[in-house]
Amino acid sequence: MTLHAYLGRAGTGKSTKMLTEIKQKMKADPLGDPIILIAPTQSTFQLEQAFVNDPELNGSLRTEVLHFERLSHRIFQEVGSYSEQKLSKAATEMMIYNIVQEQQKYLKLYQSQAKYYGFSEKLTEQIQDFKKYAVTPEHLESFIADKNMQTRTKNKLEDIALIYREFEQRIQNEFITGEDALQYFIDCMPKSEWLKRADIYIDGFHNFSTIEYLIIKGLIKYAKSVTIILTTDGNHDQFSLFRKPSEVLRHIEEISNELNISIERQYFNQLYRFNNQDLKHLEQEFDALQINRVACQGHINILESATMREEINEIARRIIVDIRDKQLRYQDIAILYRDESYAYLFDSILPLYNIPYNIDTKRSMTHHPVMEMIRSLIEVIQSNWQINPMLRLLKTDVLTTSYLKSAYLVDLLENFVLERGIYGKRWLDDELFNVEHFSKMGRKAHKLTEDERNTFEQVVKLKKDVIDKILHFEKQMSQAATVKDFATAFYESMEYFELPNQLMTERDELDLNGNHEKAEEIDQIWNGLIQILDDLVLVFGDEPMSMERFLEVFDIGLEQLEFVMIPQTLDQVSIGTMDLAKVDNKQHVYLVGMNDGTMPQPVTASSLITDEEKKYFEQQANVELSPTSDILQMDEAFVCYVAMTRAKGNVTFSYSLMGSSGDDKEISPFLNQIQSLFNQLEITNIPQYHEVNPLSLMQHAKQTKITLFEALRAWLDDEIVADSWLDAYQVIRDSDHLSQGLDYLMSALTFDNETVKLGETLSKDLYGKEINASVSRFEGYQQCPFKHYASHGLKLNERTKYELQNFDLGDIFHSVLKYISERINGDFKQLDLKKIRQLTNEALEEILPKVQFNLLNSSAYYRYLSRRIGAIVETTLSALKYQGTYSKFMPKHFETSFRRKPRTNDELIAQTLTTTQGIPINIRGQIDRIDTYTKNDTSFVNIIDYKSSEGSATLDLTKVYYGMQMQMMTYMDIVLQNKQRLGLTDIVKPGGLLYFHVHEPRIKFKSWADIDEDKLEQDLIKKFKLSGLVNADQTVIDALDIRLEPKFTSDIVPVGLNKDGSLSKRGSQVADEATIYKFIQHNKENFIETASNIMDGHTEVAPLKYKQKLPCAFCSYQSVCHVDGMIDSKRYRTVDETINPIEAIQNININDEFGGEQ
């Protein structure tokens, strides 16, 4: 047995010497003693290719490239393997999770964390870490017993030891872990005659675990020879660049001393890898204490980009240049990264440039539709059919592929179930999914067309099919008692879903279309699913388990599944992480994401045991554990060194100034260090570079068109653009091959976010030959013409959800107050507390079940909200009683509707107006309350409007003047026109236009001592004071509040008197009768103007800004109009807010008879 060590810095020919040595032995004796090359898992494929592709060898029966685990299997084939079943990573995790749940009550520190999936994962990692470093439960238990330590640390180690011990007992004589298998491999080494004849080479490693050192020790002891290759200069200084591999060398020296074998060291000092002085100087001087600066010859570049996306786009362009102009092949190029955010960018950007690549990393299967379907199916059962997992299940499209346009059907179903609040076993109620119910989707019911009916029938059929499958799954699972039963039931359910056939069909189609990677994913998904089921049966077998626990454990297993993709072609760019990727002797290596915080990367302890606890354990127990954070931090420079010395021709470093979440980023200090080694190594700012060299952006036809679009956009905005872009446009335009898609891009150049004025015919087609509308529709137009166009022209509707909206609350209050008012004939004065509560309960029992499909009885929260609504109504009735006590006006009519042609005698007639185009305007609506007071054959009327929002319970006369608030004047106009239908006298005059705010008032107190219950009740009632505008006629003033006297301000209406008996300006909101009539007539003119603009086809995105507020804040159509408050201020309309509206209206010359009796 001999031991060799090839030592040297990167690129000095160590691996080449090894490969040459192996090659010579193979040529000399192709069937001689075995030669074993041990390498990291991610390097084995590359090394195998090197032997296969060597024209002098064309493969070999003598040499094998193996990692430690595969080597153990090779020995087991010879001497016999263990009898126990080997646990996969997923099986180990599932077993530990189940143990944690069973032992939860015995845990001291982690009892509350035990229920979380992530805890068992951390615990599994910790146990595997202990196994790698040969730490047993006995080690932990004896250490805890012998040492005094902090209570938290002791409790932590006791918890871990408890689970570790239980795990070891469960697997004893029945199962074996990967780490235990390696220990068994060590025990088998002396029996292997094959190993005794073998020459062993170990290359590509920079550190080993304790169990791996024990394997190396066995190889040295029993193999014919062992040669280990290490990237180190032999310096054992713990602060040396080569600390990590030198630590390996120190361990090997200890092993050799223990075995009494000398190490034959061979030092490699001559640099062979690098083709130029730049890379040689970079390697030699990176860790130099005294810098020797030389001129850079252009083989090293540092790129600075604004964003990560721009960074990868630039790398892609430079790869195209490498291939096209420098005659490289894709396989000559590698990209190394460290920030995981780049993996997504590679997948999204490199295909746009048609660059073949392979990312050497495992991807989780979690987000694949099949896995999402299975996990959603599990959650549906666990959550008792809650809506979110159900919708996720449906949207995977795995169970609905047989339906044409299944995604559209699922969208319709989602709209319906969100509106109806379908959850739990309501999914099974066929009556809820009657096709006729779909006609009520949204706010207005309509008769279904034949196409709509057919579509909704398909929706119902799709729902039934999926429900049948879920019910079958639930039934099968509910009948199971043991883990084996559950696994069998699950597999049979998948067969009932026809999932195997479906997946195999999909795989074959993908293969036929050349999408082999996606086809491979399908295979791995199915095989992974079967493996988890097999693991469950293997680990738990006939062990009884609840369905809930089984589904939890099963989900844990699914979490562990990962795609392991082999390269789809040989000629492709290799992409990997700087820490793990094994790329050697590439012509060009790109190191992306070279930012501070990534390289070097702050290393923080993520295991259950902290760094301090590790150090204490190592010192006191005399064992070695995985490196602590501070040790790993010291090795960051070595990681950078290894990554940048993989190239033999060129190295390009790149970094961005902004992270994936928009955060600022700094350049890596290693780049500053590298830059200091050269005289002419400047950082290239990518945007500035392209500005000077626009042709550098024109590397790929498709991407050049996109960049051309940006350049032409700048040119149209009168910015200076290089002539080469105009030349590029002409070349692309004149080429049949290149011009594809150019017309679409050019049309986008002239796109402006402006609407088009509708023609007369189209306006009539959209809005009809007469306008039948509520007041709020006209107010909406005044807020923004586009809002009106979107809602009433395009008829866009928001998705209705099963939740209480603000307008629902308003409707409830209106309905309840109408119900009670009619029961008492508007005589609120007669109410006492008992009567108020009785009537409130009656009204709520009658009305609440009709709201949103009985929404207010659907949950504890909504039932609580119902009680809150009841309390508000009771307080409101108390306020109405108080107001009625001191007012001569009597409520007479409630929720009175009006329209052009009344349907009943109780409805009022609305006068028809006409637009400038001759289009009739028919206004409809409903007046909450009409109060009347008659004196001397003259009737005065008050309009009372209930508002549940404080912001809308104010009459702003400026808004009235400009047509932004049209409701109250319209209502008063309608009442004045309908004196006969209302049973009023010949002379009818306006009294007040008043808002009543239905709310839950609050009063602030400085201390409890300030509270007087009687006064508190009075103060709360006063919070309901009416607001609006009152006729200044003395008769009206006297009737509104009988308590009015000099120096008194009413607490029920907006009227107050000075000490001389005149109306106070501060406490009164009044106008004379003529002014009110002028407001009414001006309001009509606003109707006509607004309706005329609508029929003229105005659809501008032009919100009206008033008092620094925009209607956009509460608009549902911003995603359609794309108005931006930061850049679209020129679109805003404004009005003169400084006017005195009463003076302004008085100055208008209006000739009108103020309507007439209809």
Swiss-Prot record:
GO biological process: double-strand break repair via homologous recombination
Cofactor dependence: Mg(2+); [4Fe-4S] cluster
Coiled-coil parts of chain: none
EC number(s) from the headed UniProt entry: 3.1.-.-
Gene3D superfamilies to which the protein is assigned, alphabetical: 3.90.320.10, P-loop containing nucleotide triphosphate hydrolases
GO molecular function per UniProt: 4 iron, 4 sulfur cluster binding; 5'-3' exonuclease activity; ATP binding; double-stranded DNA binding; helicase activity; metal ion binding
Note: Despite having conserved helicase domains, this subunit does not have helicase activity.
UniProt-recorded name of the protein: ATP-dependent helicase/deoxyribonuclease subunit B
Organism: Staphylococcus aureus (strain MRSA252)
